[in-house]
């Protein structure tokens, strides 16, 4: 009975450790994907709107 408890505890512990490692890797990949998306969006914004000097307006005011 004692051997059964120890082996069951060991199996559950190893399962918990492997599960937490998988969750950590999953979280890391999601963060990397989000960072890539943010970088792509900022690059698109730079391409769409060129930088203008402060106070510059494309409209002429007479």
UniProtKB/Swiss-Prot annotation:
Q: Which family does it belong to?
A: Belongs to the frog skin active peptide (FSAP) family. Bradykinin-related peptide subfamily.
An annotated GO BP:
defense response
Q: Where is the composition biased (Acidic residues)?
A: 30-42
Tell me yes or no: is Transcription regulation among this UniProt entry's keywords: no
Q: Which organism is it from?
A: Phyllomedusa sauvagei
Q: What is the lineage of its organism?
A: Eukaryota, Metazoa, Chordata, Craniata, Vertebrata
**Which keywords fit this entry according to its UniProt record?**
Amphibian defense peptide, Bradykinin receptor impairing toxin, G-protein coupled receptor impairing toxin, Hydroxylation, Secreted, Signal, Sulfation, Toxin
GO MF terms listed in the record are: toxin activity
Q: Which domain of life is it from?
A: Eukaryota
Signal sequence, renumbered to the chain: 1-22
Instruction: Identify residues that carry 4-hydroxyproline.
Output: 54
Instruction: Provide the free-text tissue specificity comment from this protein's UniProt record.
Output: Expressed by the skin glands.
Q: Where is this region: Disordered?
A: 24-62
Q: Which InterPro entries match?
A: Frog_antimicrobial_propeptide
Residues bearing the modification Sulfotyrosine: 62
Annotated compartments: Secreted
Name of this protein: Kininogen-1
Q: Name one GO cellular component term.
A: extracellular region
């Amino acid at each position: 009975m004692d051997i059964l408890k120890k082996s069951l505890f060991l199996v559950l512990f190893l399962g918990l450790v492997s599960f937490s490692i998988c969750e950590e890797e999953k979280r890391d990949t999601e963060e990397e994907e989000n960072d890539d998306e943010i970088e792509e969006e900022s690059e698109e914004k730079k391409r769409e709107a060129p930088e203008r000097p402060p106070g510059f307006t494309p409209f002429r005011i007479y």
